[in-house]
Amino acid sequence: MRLTDLLPEMMNIDPIMRETEISGLTADSRRVEPGYLFAALPSATENSGTDGRDYIEDAVARGAVAILAPDGTTVETPGENAPCVITDENPRWRLAQFASRFYEKQPRTVIGITGTNGKSSVAGFTRQIWSVLGETSASMGTLGLDADGFDAGPSLT
C-alpha cells in the first residue's frame, strides 16, 4: 500500500514520498521490518517513562520508511534512507486511521468479556459454541491470540 493511500487528506508531504510503499505498521521499534511505518508515540502517561520518539533511530536502522510522530518532532537522518516524517497533533488517533485503511477487513462483531474470574474460560467456551455453529471467531487476551489456523502465545503478560 502506498503512503498516499494511508493519508490521502494529508498531502502536505513531499510529493516523492507520497509514493512510498508501506508494508506494515507498528509502534514497537523492535518489530520494524524494511518498508514499515513506525509510529513514534509519546508516553501514554507521565509516569511510564517510555516515549516512542526515543526509538526513531532504531526503527530507521531496521528499515522504517515512514515515521508518524507528534507535531514538532524532527528526525535527523540524511541521505537516501531518510524516512518520510509525518507529524500530527494526535498521532494515536492518526495511527488508528492508518490501521483501519491498511488492514481493511474488520470483524462485523466484537465482544468483550470483563470481570475478575473466568474470562478466559468464557471466551474459550464461546469460541467453541460459535465454531459448532459455523461462525468464525478469535480470542485475544492474557493467554495470547487464538484463531482458526493461527495461534500466538502471550507476548506481554
Model-derived features with residue positions:
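Phosphate-binding loop of NTP-binding sites
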Residues: 93-157
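N-terminal leader/targeting and accessory segments in enzymes
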Residues: 1-97
